[in-house]
Curated annotation (Swiss-Prot):
The chain crosses the membrane at residues 18-38, 46-66, 97-117, 138-158, 166-186, 212-232, 247-267, 287-307, 339-359, 368-388, 395-415, 418-438. The gene is kup. It comes from the Bacteria. This is Probable potassium transport system protein Kup. It comes from Trichlorobacter lovleyi (strain ATCC BAA-1151 / DSM 17278 / SZ). It catalyses: K(+)(in) + H(+)(in) = K(+)(out) + H(+)(out).
Amino acid sequence: MQQHDSDSFWGGIVKAMGLVFGDIGTSPIYTLTVVFALTEPTMQNVFGILSLVFWTMTILVTAEYAWLAMRLGRKGEGGAIVLKEILARMIRPGRQLTFVVFLTYLGVSLLMGDGVITPAISILSAVEGMVLIPGLGGLHQSWLILIAAIIAVGLFVFQFKGTDKVAGAFGPIMVVWFASLALSGAVSVASHPTVLFAVSPHYALQFLLDNGLAGFIVLSEVILCATGGEALYADMGHLGRKPIVRAWYIVFWALYLNYLGQGAFIISHPGAKNYLFGMVQHQAPLLYIPFLILTILATIIASQAMISGVFSIVYQGITTRILPLLKVDYTSSHLKSQIYIGSVNWMLMIAVVVIMLVFQKSENLAAAYGLAVTGSMSITGIMMILILSRTTKAWKAVFAALITVVDLVFFTACLHKLPHGGYWSIILASVPFITILVWTKGQRALYRALRPLELDTFELAYEQIYAKGRNIPGTGLFFVKEYNVVPPYVVHCIIRSNIIYERNVFISIVRTDEPFGLVSELKTGIATGLDAFEIHAGYMEHLEIETLLQQHGIKEKVIFYGVEDISTPNPVWKLFATIKRQTPNFVQFNKLPASRLQGVVTRVEM
């Protein structure tokens, strides 16, 4: 699955620009415009904001993700679930592990909620640049929303075909985008070179001291420059750490040079409505339309990266059993990381269009943006402290703690957004969060309610029935959670109904706490005519069960699996039962041959 080792130095950097940096790379479209909608664009304030932008990107993206988090991968994979799996090995079961699991669920949910806001604000802000085209200045906002919605819907409709064929163009397009940002910024800085001094932290501190509470609240808009920074770590599995970090150093200076250029433009044109588009139009009116097209392409690529990221998170959630099984399609014949989850895709599409209609303008959308990002960054920081403090490099935990304090300061500043649209971040994140809680608790409660039988007890009755010699020719396959614990449906089939084959195989799939790795083992002679087939697979591995069975010489005549008919007065368990009914069962998820499947219903009281 991993192809990044063979990528060339520059090839890896170009790929990273296309796959990882779309979100943070499109932040200059709206960040300073939103900030100076709240703040008077005086020279002193411009210097203060530019300094805050520099240090926000340095601390929250470079230090937190590029330097610290990206060294905490598992077989090249990153993300909240990876951090949880690392900690699970370090912490004994108890309150602390429960806290870590809760943080993981929250972090995953916030990132998935972010998958709605990112495409909405990116595409809408790019389309709004059309009003600066001569003759389109009077274009009504409703037309801009319609155009943005059409682009978004087109992007989601295209998902089922996969991005394999066009993904090769993402990197080169983003290279042109970052080069354009850097060039435009450099030209503007040349007219006002004193803005280069804004890198000094003195200006950031002075701004915060001079503006007090208002300055603190401005941090909730400054954070927009770092949104998408978490993708460095979350997308590490696609390319590896080195290409992403190398690309980030180039992207960082391209972005900051553009922010400096916008700062210089603001000083000379404080009345401009959108600083990036205004700056480019002022510099090269003839190139404005090509630049606008490039901007829209960049936001589409940014949105695509976020959609693919959500698919990847959901797949991790499915295989680690924190989310229900969903239909997963593989859109690439050679890259198993290229997946499509239809139900998630259409839910995202509807949510993105609704968000566009609710907020109308990108500057309004900015009011909802930031809360989920800073929450996710804070959770990453807390988990890094817990991990690093338990390693031989415990001194790194001190740096992680300082960074986490900065994360929490930004998160606190973003809380003021709650009544101004920020509550949408909570609403969007609550959908996956509630689903995760209901599903995980429901699975545990269901397992207890099923009251499985110990293998030793089962064998006594099994041997008596098998010895009668009325066995069905061929091989019967029975799916179980663990081969030494027998579920009720197997007891019903074999013991009560005497459905017993010449060869009976219990098959169990165990997902390990590593992202990759696949080991299968056939244990023969557990009892007369009874074998166990165990598959140990990493939580990112795509399983081809039929192939594995053939490799071990198992030619099944029929495949049995359990179907639970849940009866409960509890509203939470009713929701769990509904989710279970509406989502694919285990055999459907693994695309086993329908002609050989036999579901056995077990009535369960929860």
